[in-house]
């Protein structure tokens, strides 16, 4: 029997909800917390119109939000497109366009790069990209395409949401679209 990534987390969260799932500089996350956050993010993204098969680009350094967003995509049946946050603007633009990502999840700034400004510049060149989700503290009220990660988690908590991945075929669908630098 083939099991989806979303189902693996959900099963483990049911069996061992208080057991450590992830240890990071930000602290400890349990299986129950990870599953709950992934479900909330999936519900919020689904509320924005993200569906099974849509591409979700992740431009994040190693952090808990990367893991939660990955599992949220799995719960949606979406395709994860992990991208190196160190990519220069032109390469990032190409990969986002080529992947046809409808959502990008990133940090507000990383290693001196202002991703909010970068995406403001990129939006006109990326017709498929509908939303940007940012991990950080800045108030983003000025653009209805940009959402704070924490706000989406809050808005998705407790939503009645039937996960696409629970419908049975998700384990056999494409889950990730991986780009390389071309070197080995």
Q: Where on the chain are the PLM-derived regions?
A:
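Conserved AMP-binding A3 loop
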Residues: 30-33, 175-184
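Structural core segment of the AMP-binding/adenylate-forming
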Residues: 47-48, 78-151
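Conserved G/P- and acidic residue-centered "switch" motifs that form tight phosphate/ATP-binding loops
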Residues: 56, 77, 183
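Hydrophobic alpha-helical segments in the ANL/AMP-binding
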Residues: 9-11, 42, 46, 64-83, ...
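Conserved AMP-binding/adenylate-forming core of the ANL superfamily
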Residues: 2, 18-63, 67-71, 88-93, ...
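AMP-dependent adenylate-forming
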Residues: 7-30, 134-141
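Conserved pre-ATP/AMP-binding loop-to-beta segment of ANL
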Residues: 2, 17-18, 134, 139-140, ...
